[in-house]
């Protein structure tokens, strides 16, 4: 695959992985991206997952056409990108590894000391000339590991963005970018919005024509769309108008309340309502929707003087990713001492700029006229 006249794609598609990072379902697989810059000196940008050593080295050999690379640039040390550093150096022992000091420390941790005999330690803002192409290294700590840096090629105006602007899905599957990029961002990078904002500010000073991430397609058209979404996500603003109703239910009574609220909102003309059974939906997609929409209703039962486990897990996913700037409402159920709303609100106590609905729906075992009226009032408050 040709990115520009001098930049080639050397990555691989993985359709064997079932859970990315041990937790995210990837029905359309994953791409582990690597790039080669062909110039007077040749730079290889990152490696790939350990299971694709031979395929990746074969890809490199075809692109190199008998030449040998001068540099391996390591932007990110997560093993799906760094696992083949040793195999690369075994194949091309004269190549120098280009990375920052934190990256070299991690290389020692993963591979043991002494792997990189020929190395170029770069600092933030430093450049490396390949001949026609000049690479500038921009540090991006905690996007989403501390050693991360991105690389800007000023000749072809390409930003090699590490995990930034990545998405789930292999490159041989055609699918819309936004949803799987959103799920990827919220799940993996979402905690570090401030750090992403800092990187976006640095990137704004660059003349970028192409973004080459470590997962997902190279982005060439309408870059403003992708950058705008990253700005929204990393500033914790709602992307779309709508209400998400996330519920857990033991015997169906809390589910009935959630479905009633869904119906009432639709009757009132709510632009978008997403109803999610947390025991059965994909948790990462549920978290994605909570961040996508501006309003969230949490409905669950009191369980062991706490809340139902799937709801607790869901809220923990939200808070560890700095959930904020949203409107939240509660529906609680309890046969003798309903306290779920109190527990859920306490879990969100440290979340910034949360507006709570005036009405909390309290169900004692099953919906009755009083709790139905509360649901109807909550629907009005959400409009």
Protein language model annotation of sequence segments:
Residues 45-47, 69-77, 97-100, 159-163, ...:
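Active-site neighborhood of phospho(di)ester-bond hydrolases with catalytic His/Asp-centered motifs
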Residues 144, 148, 164-191, 234-239:
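Active-site-proximal loop/helix segment associated with metal-binding centers of metalloenzymes
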């Amino acid at each position: 695959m040709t990115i520009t006249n001098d930049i080639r794609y050397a990555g691989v598609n993985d359709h064997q992985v079932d859970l990315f990072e041990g937790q995210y379902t990837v029905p359309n697989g994953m791409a582990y991206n690597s790039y080669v810059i062909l110039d007077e000196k040749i730079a290889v940008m990152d490696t790939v997952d350990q299971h694709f050593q031979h395929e990746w080295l074969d890809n490199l050999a075809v692109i190199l056409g008998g030449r040998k690379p001068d540099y391996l640039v390591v932007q990110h040390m997560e093993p799906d990108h760094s696992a083949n550093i040793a195999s690369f150096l075994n194949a091309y022992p004269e190549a120098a590894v280009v990375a920052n000091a934190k990256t070299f420390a991690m290389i020692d941790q993963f591979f043991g000391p002494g792997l990189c005999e020929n190395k170029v330690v770069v600092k933030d803002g430093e450049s490396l000339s390949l001949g026609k192409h000049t690479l500038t290294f921009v540090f991006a700590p905690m996007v989403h590991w501390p050693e991360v840096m991105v690389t800007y090629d000023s000749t072809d105006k390409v930003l090699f963005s590490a995990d930034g602007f990545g998405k789930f899905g292999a490159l041989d599957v055609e699918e819309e970018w936004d949803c799987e990029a959103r799920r990827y961002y919220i799940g993996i990078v979402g905690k570090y919005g401030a750090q992403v904002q800092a990187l976006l500010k640095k990137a704004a000073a660059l003349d970028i024509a192409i973004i080459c991430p470590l997962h997902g397609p190279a982005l060439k058209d309408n870059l403003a769309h992708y950058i705008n979404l990253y700005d929204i996500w990393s500033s914790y603003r709602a992307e779309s108008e709508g209400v998400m109703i996330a519920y857990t239910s033991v015997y169906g009574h809390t589910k009935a309340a959630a479905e009633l609220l869904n119906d009432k909102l639709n009757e009132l003309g709510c632009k978008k309502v997403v109803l999610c059974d947390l025991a059965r939906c994909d948790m990462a997609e549920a978290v994605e929707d909570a961040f996508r929409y501006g309003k969230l209703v949490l409905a669950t039962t009191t369980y062991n003087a706490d809340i139902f486990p799937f709801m607790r897990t869901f809220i923990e996913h939200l808070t560890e990713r700095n959930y904020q700037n949203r409107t939240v409402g509660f529906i609680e159920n309890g046969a003798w001492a309903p306290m779920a709303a109190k527990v859920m609100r306490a879990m969100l106590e440290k979340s910034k700029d949360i507006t709570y609905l005036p009405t909390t729906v309290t169900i004692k075992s099953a919906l009755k006229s009083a709790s139905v009226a509360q649901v109807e009032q909550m629907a009005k408050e959400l409009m």
